[in-house]
């Protein structure tokens, strides 16, 4: 995304600026004050993107192959994998183009590069928005399955889930086009930040509510079988730990990127903020890491999906 302070604009590569040496150290801002700058090696960035790409392709292939997985829940998981695939793929594509331009292996007009840059940015932004939306959709789906278990199949029908999925993709593409077109307006960046916070609050409220219901259910079973209280307490601790990990990973991987957007609006010239801007590639790397972790949390925990995945891998050999 063409954000102030982000060293990713393709047009900047036409100047043949040498790539920074990978390091973790102090860099100076425009006033000479020291800044902590973490430089991510291009090879590491591309390797993480490739891992995410392969992992999410396998999830999509497994769900597409097994008709038993063609349920609303797995449709949302499949779309999450597809959007994560696009997040990693678009970032890898832009990084590859930047490296080719810097190395002189790709020579083209500045207008063509700018058009390619805008196209990739729309793809990146829309896939990021889709990824966040489908994380929220999965949380809503699980909440309905727990609190409206008897009516779940009448509430969350496959056609209804397909309409929700189509609406998310269309809204994300349209929104990302507007965001990229008007990226220099503060209101646009603030909308993205508010959207992230809304998804974080939605997921936190729904998962905490589900954890509370699960603890009540476990407590009822404990009373029914006259077991000792520690069994229920242990369940609550495990559930709280799982919830903390789930929300913690989401916040740690996505939070720095949206903090960057917020700082672009409120303190673009501040010394501390300018130091944070130097680590933009780190924030993108964290998002790539999230696209690697998502299948582990939402997809690979399913025994049916793992079995299908083995079949897909065996068929490919």
UniProtKB/Swiss-Prot annotation:
A lipid is attached at residue 315 (S-palmitoyl cysteine). InterPro entries: GPCR_Rhodpsn, GPCR_Rhodpsn_7TM, Melcrt_ACTH_rcpt, MSH_rcpt. Keywords: Cell membrane, G-protein coupled receptor, Glycoprotein, Lipoprotein, Membrane, Palmitate, Receptor, Transducer, Transmembrane, Transmembrane helix. One of its GO terms (molecular function) is melanocyte-stimulating hormone receptor activity. Residues 1-37, 94-118, 184-191, 267-279 are extracellular. One of its GO terms (biological process) is adenylate cyclase-activating G protein-coupled receptor signaling pathway. The chain crosses the membrane at residues 38-63, 73-93, 119-140, 164-183, 192-211, 241-266, 280-300. It is a multi-pass membrane protein. One of its GO terms (cellular component) is plasma membrane. Glycans are attached at residue 29. The keyword Oxidoreductase does not apply. It is found in: Cell membrane. Coiled coil: none annotated. Residues 64-72, 141-163, 212-240, 301-317 are cytoplasmic. Belongs to the G-protein coupled receptor 1 family. PANTHER family: G-PROTEIN COUPLED RECEPTOR. Receptor for MSH (alpha, beta and gamma) and ACTH. The activity of this receptor is mediated by G proteins which activate adenylate cyclase. Mediates melanogenesis, the production of eumelanin (black/brown) and phaeomelanin (red/yellow), via regulation of cAMP signaling in melanocytes. Interacts with MGRN1, but does not undergo MGRN1-mediated ubiquitination; this interaction competes with GNAS-binding and thus inhibits agonist-induced cAMP production. Interacts with OPN3; the interaction results in a decrease in MC1R-mediated cAMP signaling and ultimately a decrease in melanin production in melanocytes. This is Melanocyte-stimulating hormone receptor. It comes from Saimiri oerstedii. The gene is MC1R.
């Amino acid at each position: 995304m063409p954000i102030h302070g982000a060293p990713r604009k393709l047009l900047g590569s036409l100047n043949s600026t040498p790539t920074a040496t990978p390091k973790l150290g102090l860099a100076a801002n425009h006033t000479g004050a020291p800044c902590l700058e973490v430089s991510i090696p291009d090879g590491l960035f591309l390797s993480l993107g490739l891992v995410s790409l392969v992992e999410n392709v396998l999830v999509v292939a497994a769900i597409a192959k097994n008709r038993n997985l063609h349920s609303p829940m797995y449709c949302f998981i499949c779309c999450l994998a597809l959007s994560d695939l696009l997040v990693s793929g678009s970032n890898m594509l832009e990084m590859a183009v930047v490296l080719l331009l810097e190395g002189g292996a790709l020579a083209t007009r500045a207008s063509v590069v700018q058009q390619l840059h805008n196209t990739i940015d729309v793809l990146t932004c829309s896939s990021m928005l889709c990824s966040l939306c489908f994380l929220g959709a999965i949380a809503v789906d699980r909440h309905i399955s727990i609190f409206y278990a008897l009516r779940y199949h009448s509430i969350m029908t496959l056609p209804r889930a397909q309409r929700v999925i189509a609406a998310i993709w269309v809204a994300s593409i349209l929104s990302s086009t507007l965001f990229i077109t008007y990226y220099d307006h503060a209101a646009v960046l603030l909308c993205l930040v508010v959207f992230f916070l809304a998804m974080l609050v939605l997921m936190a409220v729904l998962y905490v509510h589900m954890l509370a219901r699960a603890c009540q259910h476990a407590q009822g079973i404990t009373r029914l079988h006259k077991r000792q209280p520690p069994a229920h307490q242990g369940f609550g601790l495990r559930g709280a730990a799982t919830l903390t990990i789930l929300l913690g990973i989401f916040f740690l991987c996505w939070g720095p990127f949206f903090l960057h957007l917020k700082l672009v609006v409120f303190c673009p010239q501040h010394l501390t903020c300018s130091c944070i801007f130097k680590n933009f590639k780190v924030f993108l790397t964290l998002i790539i890491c999230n696209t690697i972790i998502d299948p582990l949390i939402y997809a690979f925990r399913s025994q049916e999906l793992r079995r299908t995945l083995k079949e897909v891998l065996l068929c490919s050999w």
